[in-house]
Swiss-Prot record:
It catalyses: dihydroxyacetone phosphate = methylglyoxal + phosphate. GO terms for cellular component: cytosol. This is Methylglyoxal synthase. Keywords: Lyase. It comes from the Bacteria. The keyword Nucleotidyltransferase does not apply. InterPro entries: Methylgl_synth (IPR004363), Methylglyoxal_synth_AS (IPR018148), MGS-like_dom (IPR011607), MGS-like_dom_sf (IPR036914). It comes from Clostridium acetobutylicum (strain ATCC 824 / DSM 792 / JCM 1419 / IAM 19013 / LMG 5710 / NBRC 13948 / NRRL B-527 / VKM B-1787 / 2291 / W). Catalyzes the formation of methylglyoxal from dihydroxyacetone phosphate. The active site is at residue 64. Residues 1-145 form the MGS-like domain. The gene is mgsA. The keyword Ligase does not apply.
């Protein structure tokens, strides 16, 4: 991944205010990267901060899956996902799939403000970084043949 990161910004409804506040506090750093997000979250961040945030669909309308596809296509390097651990979501299976893809493709994920702070302030944010993607095709061949 390049020094200019492609960052996805995602938040469940009860966590949107926290993500917007975090983006406001970190807008200078975020402005140096390409940003995208799920529908409402992207719109609210753009309105609050003036940052350009490419909007995918809303999470329950397929936005989580769109972000997952973008990760697979190497169009997203990094994800800030403030999720609500106390409320069941109608699209929980999509969220689980998004997290699985994020781990599979070795992208950094922050799911709370503390982790987001650690990641965004890391010296690696300004550098190129090599992902360590597990070759599952090799594993499948080895286990089955």
């Amino acid at each position: 991944m390049n020094s200019k990161k492609k960052i996805a910004l995602v938040a469940h409804d009860n966590r949107k205010k926290a993500l917007i506040s975090w983006c406001e506090a970190n807008s200078e750093v975020l402005s140096n990267h390409s940003l995208c997000g799920t529908g409402t979250t992207a719109k609210l961040i753009k309105e609050a901060t003036g940052l350009e945030v490419f909007p995918y669909k809303s999470g329950p309308m397929g936005g989580d899956q769109q972000i997952g596809a973008a990760i697979v296509n190497e169009d997203i390097d990094f994800m800030i996902f403030f999720w609500d651990p106390l409320t069941a979501q109608p699209h929980d299976p999509d969220v689980k799939a998004l997290l699985r893809i994020s781990v599979l493709y070795d992208i950094p994920i922050a799911m709370n403000e503390s982790t987001a702070e650690f990641l965004i302030k890391s010296p690696i944010m300004k550098e190129q970084h090599e992902r360590h993607i597990i070759d599952y095709y090799q594993k499948i061949r080895k286990d089955n043949f």
